[in-house]
Structures are given as structure tokens and as C-alpha cells.
């Protein structure tokens, strides 16, 4: 029986660890990074009048946008202020109107 050289075993372990790191990167880190970027662009595109949903499931219409907060009108006389990060999506069926560029 031949014994594997210590250098070969070490090289195999290094290659194995690099492969695990690459799998971790492409399956976890990269998709999260893309999702964060998509959410950032979504938040930047919000305008007054947009119909949105918060992470807690509250549906409302944007009435005010601050640097770090967004105020939603959720009922006739009810407005609630949220952190921008709490806004996760447009309401189903809501079509955002594009501004015409002349």
C-alpha cells in the first residue's frame, strides 16, 4: 500500500476548503447581495401615492418620504411612520405610473 504524501493531503484539504467557500459564496452571499441591491433600488424609486406593503403586512399608500422613514396612509384618518427598510413590496395588482419624459 502506498501512503499519501503530507503535501498531497494538505493540497487536497486546501482545494476542498476553497470549493466549500465558493459554494457558500455562490449559494448564499451573492444572492443576498443581489437582493439587498434590488431592495435599495426599490426604496429609491418610491414616490408619493405608491401603494406598498410593509414587512409586518400593513398595506398603505405613501404620503411622505423622509431620509430614513416613510409615512403611509393606512385608513381615511390614519397615518403610520415606518423605517424605509420595512417597506418590502408594491401591493399586488398595483401598477406604478411612469412619469413622462419630454
UniProtKB/Swiss-Prot annotation:
Q: What is its main location?
A: membrane
Q: Which GO terms describe its biological process?
A: protein transport
Q: Which InterPro entries match?
A: Preprotein_translocase_YajC
Q: Which UniProt keywords apply?
A: Cell inner membrane, Cell membrane, Membrane, Protein transport, Translocation, Transmembrane, Transmembrane helix, Transport
Membrane spanning stretches:
9-29
Q: Does the keyword Transmembrane apply?
A: yes
Cell location: Cell inner membrane
User: What GO terms fall under cellular component here?
Assistant: plasma membrane
Topology term for the membrane: Single-pass membrane protein
Keyword Transmembrane helix set for record: yes
Which Pfam families does the entry mention?
Answer: YajC (PF02699)
Q: What does this protein do?
A: The SecYEG-SecDF-YajC-YidC holo-translocon (HTL) protein secretase/insertase is a supercomplex required for protein secretion, insertion of proteins into membranes, and assembly of membrane protein complexes. While the SecYEG complex is essential for assembly of a number of proteins and complexes, the SecDF-YajC-YidC subcomplex facilitates these functions.
Query: Which family, according to the similarity comment?
Result: Belongs to the YajC family.
Q: Subunit arrangement?
A: Part of the SecDF-YidC-YajC translocase complex. The SecDF-YidC-YajC translocase forms a supercomplex with SecYEG, called the holo-translocon (HTL).
Q: List the NCBIfam families.
A: yajC
Annotated protein name in UniProt: Sec translocon accessory complex subunit YajC
Q: What is the species listed in this Swiss-Prot or TrEMBL entry?
A: Aquifex aeolicus (strain VF5)
Source taxonomy: Bacteria, Pseudomonadati, Aquificota, Aquificia, Aquificales
Gene that codes for this? Answer: yajC
